[in-house]
Design a protein with these regions (language model features):
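Cytoplasmic-side transmembrane-helix entry/capping segments in multi-pass membrane proteins
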Residues: 12, 69-78, 126-139, 187-197, ...
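Hydrophobic alpha-helical transmembrane segments of multi-pass membrane transport proteins
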Residues: 13-21, 25, 53, 74-97, ...
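Residue-level recognition of pore/gate-forming positions within transmembrane alpha-helices
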Residues: 16-19, 43-47, 111-112, 135-138, ...
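Juxtamembrane helix-loop-helix junctions in multi-pass membrane proteins
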Residues: 17-48, 99-101, 176-199, 249
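Membrane-interface helix-cap regions at the ends of transmembrane helices
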Residues: 21, 25-28, 32, 46-68, ...
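Hydrophobic/aromatic residues within transmembrane alpha-helices
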Residues: 29, 38, 42, 94, ...
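Hydrophobic transmembrane alpha-helices of multi-pass small-molecule transport proteins
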Residues: 50, 109, 117, 127-150, ...
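Loop-to-transmembrane alpha-helix entry segments
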Residues: 64-74, 104-107, 123-144, 157-163, ...
Length: 262
């Protein structure tokens, strides 16, 4: 297992700050857009920004000529699904029916999911008692800071139970997405990040249009929230996420979710 560097810790803190604002950005975007449309717009904007940067910097996307290339594209596709399309859509929809506190605590579950996944799938992160104890203490600390009542607040929405499940499934997707990124063969961080976002947008587009239709021109606050989501918690955050996972591992990266609810 790679020991995290100071640069890794700085990147982790920055990622936590950026992702922490994503719930507010989503709340603003949902004023005018449906949850699937918000997910599509943030991923599409982020993919366009990173594609321009990738091309301008001369970085190349992997081809399809070798088994390794095809394996890389498989991981990129899974990244688009597990790290972008599915969790963004589920969290956006869930936020319509659950308290923000519950959504935040759900993200704090991710490290507890990644630890056993890393142990059994990657074989490089041993699930020693010290780590288990540390991750559990971190989770309990988040609940105490936010307030245990946030877990049982009933908003009165008939779809709230399903929304809670959606938030939990989103957390599981983030955990699996981290493992998937770690398993990917060596590839440019920009190419991997950009490719995952492009595929995520392609997969989201028909679903969002079929379910929610063509969106109307939004209110200014919703537009600002959507642009913020695309540029920072998606474009910039994806680069940081992939970089941290590749250099320090998914278990270390998952600790960012202890910052997000705060």
């Amino acid at each position: 297992m790679t020991k995290p560097t100071i640069a890794n810790w700085i990147a982790l803190i920055c990622l936590g700050i950026i992702w922490g604002g994503s719930f507010m950005g989503a709340k603003l975007a949902l004023i005018s857009f449906g949850p699937m449309t918000v997910a599509l717009l943030r991923v599409s904007l982020a993919s366009m920004v990173l594609l321009i940067i990738t091309i301008a910097s001369g970085r190349k996307f992997p081809k399809f000529s070798t088994p390794t290339d095809r394996r890389i594209w498989l991981h990129i596709t899974l990244m688009g699904l597990l790290t972008n399309s599915i969790p963004f859509s589920l969290l956006n929809w869930g936020q319509l029916y659950v308290s923000s506190g519950f959504a935040g605590v759900t993200m704090a579950v991710v490290p507890l999911l990644v630890l056993p996944l890393s142990h059994f799938i990657l074989k490089s992160n041993e699930m020693v008692p010290r780590k288990i104890f540390g991750f559990i203490i971190g989770f309990i600390g988040i609940i105490v800071l936010i307030g245990p009542t946030q877990l049982i607040i009933d908003t009165g929405a008939s779809l709230e139970p399903l929304a809670r499940i959606a938030c939990i499934v989103a957390a599981l997707c983030y955990g699996l997405g981290s493992i998937n990124t770690r398993l990917c063969p060596p590839v440019s961080i920009m190419a991997y990040s950009t490719g995952g976002l492009i595929i995520g947008a392609i997969l989201l587009a028909p679903v969002a249009l079929f379910i929610e239709g063509i969106p109307q021109w939004p209110e200014t606050t919703a537009l600002v929230g959507t642009i913020y989501l695309g540029l920072f918690p998606t474009a910039l955050a994806t680069i940081l996420l992939v970089s941290i996972i590749n250099s320090a591992g998914p278990a270390f990266m998952s600790m960012v979710n202890y910052q997000v609810p705060l």
